[in-house]
Regions:
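Short, contiguous, well-structured surface segments enriched in hydrophobic/aromatic residues
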Residues: 102-117
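Short, solvent-exposed loop/turn segments at secondary-structure junctions
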Residues: 32-37, 117-121, 157-161, 194-198
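Proline-aspartate-enriched helix->loop->beta-strand connector
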Residues: 140-157
Length: 216
């Protein structure tokens, strides 16, 4: 299996789920991709510049991008850093999954988060290529084997859910709830709207999430 380029955020109570707020359920939240300002600037000089170990600006800190972003959000929740625009997405998701019953910090301490696409894009309107998605598949399986989630919650249908790999996948209804079979265990996966979508409603999404996940 291929190691992920962007290491996942793993909440402390995901690691020790016995008394977590989801009744012991280990939830993997699957996002889409990262935006990289460094890549944006590189593209001004070299249109072929691409995210990864071969990027001329690669540093080992690139691998902790996902974890660093989540930690920055948690620091904001603690009053330790200033607000940034992306934090609205993380807050809206936390409110959707908890129905406003828990703080965003509590939610993020109880879940794992991983962006499926393992190659950042240079700005928010740019989309990963089909090659980028394909090359992210093996790392996704590696994450499932290592984190052993009980359920996967996808942020978005077209960009995330529909680009996850078909190997080991079964979808009885052909649309929403299906499952991966990894090491003999079935891992259900479903999707909600991406919380960055302007029309995202935590109340509406909570109704869908509550069919599969309950806050205790």
């Amino acid at each position: 299996m291929k190691e992920p380029f962007f290491k996942p955020h793993i909440g402390e109570r995901y690691k020790n789920p016995a008394n977590n707020i989801f009744g012991g359920l280990k939830i993997l939240v699957l996002g889409h991709n990262h935006y990289c300002n460094t890549l944006f600037n590189l593209r001004k000089e070299n249109s072929e510049a691409h995210c990864g170990y071969n990027c001329e600006k690669y540093v080992k800190e690139c691998n902790s991008f996902t974890k660093d972003v989540v930690n920055e959000f948690i620091s904001y929740c603690k009053g330790e850093t200033e607000f940034d625009w992306f934090m609205n997405t993380y807050t809206k998701f936390a409110n959707a999954i908890s129905g406003y019953e828990k703080t965003p910090q509590e939610i993020w301490d109880n879940i794992a988060f991983y962006n499926f696409c393992q190659s950042a894009v240079s700005f928010d309107a740019e989309q990963p290529s089909l090659k980028d998605y394909k090359e992210s598949e093996e790392a996704f399986y590696e994450i499932l084997q290592k984190l052993k989630p009980n359920i996967i919650l996808c942020w978005g249908f077209d960009k995330v859910y529909m680009h996850t790999p078909s190997k080991y996948w079964t979808s009885p209804d052909g649309e929403n709830l299906g499952f991966y079979t990894i090491d003999g265990s079935q891992i259900p996966m479903f999707h909600i709207h991406h919380p960055s979508w302007p029309g995202f409603s935590p109340e509406t999404e909570n109704e869908k999430i509550s069919e599969h996940i309950k806050v205790k």
